[in-house]
Every structure is written in structure tokens, then in C-alpha cells.
């Protein structure tokens, strides 16, 4: 019997501003959302993406709250790519 539950993939990336540092606006993404370069507080590397708090104002359905209480963005709903840039 086929499952009615959608396939479970990895959780969306944590995009909560409370977990980011060295935040610099680098442009504007789809839906007129600010695009940022940033680092996470607990790891090395620089990433490019959006802030969940910004997305909530434009497309709240694209933001979920993880079990940890932090906001995550469903980038596929926005047509924006989350990526590591350094």
C-alpha cells in the first residue's frame, strides 16, 4: 500500500536571525526580499540567504518553526537558493 504521507527530506535550513552573525546585505532576492551574506554563531563559513523574519512578512507559509524553536525557511517555495559562499 502506498503511503499517503509526503516523502520526508532534510529539514529546511535554519534562517533565524538570532543564530547569525556578521550579517551584511548584499542584494535583493525574489519577492523583493533582502539577500544577505552571514555566518552562523556556532560554525565556520559564510552563507548567502535570507532572514526568516523578513520572509514571514512576505510569505509566511514559507517559514516553519523547528523543534528547537528557531525559524526555518523553505527556500524551494521562494525560488531562492541557500548556499555556502566561503
Where are these regions (language model features)?
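C-terminal intramolecular chaperone/autoprocessing and neck/assembly modules of extracellular spikes
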Residues: 2-86
Amino acid at each position: 500500500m502506498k503511503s499517503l504521507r509526503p516523502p520526508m527530506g532534510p529539514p529546511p535550513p535554519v534562517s533565524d536571525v538570532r543564530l547569525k552573525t556578521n550579517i551584511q546585505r548584499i542584494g535583493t532576492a525574489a519577492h523583493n526580499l533582502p539577500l544577505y551574506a552571514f555566518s552562523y554563531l556556532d560554525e565556520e563559513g559564510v552563507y548567502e540567504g535570507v532572514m526568516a523574519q523578513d520572509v514571514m512578512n512576505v510569505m509566511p507559509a514559507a517559514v516553519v518553526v523547528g523543534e528547537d524553536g528557531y525559524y526555518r525557511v523553505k527556500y524551494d517555495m521562494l525560488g531562492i537558493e541557500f548556499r555556502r559562499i566561503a
